[in-house]
């Protein structure tokens, strides 16, 4: 299987998982996923695939289905991609700064994808302002602190 075919498979899996999901501003969530993937595409295949899959585990409900997604990612893309996707997947009840970002920072692929994810979130936060100014301000502070934390 070629690298392009693997990238296409990753995008297909992300589309299946995210389905009709929308972001907080009401835009199709896959727009965010593909924007993050595009922003890291020059870093290489692994970064692009992880970007496409970066929210698949976290956004899969119910929990039982997460095991299937994890298995599909490991079987399809191997341990390097799997480890990065797991590292970038926030766990329920996990502290964002004390636990999650520390784990992300330990995986070079997850780190670069998360930085791109945060930057994309900051760029697109304007869509929230008309819907929920308070939430947009909270997220802006959170993302800026996360960028500082990750370096």
Q: Where are the regions that the model predicts?
A:
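Active-site helical microenvironments for divalent-metal-assisted chemistry
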Residues: 1-151
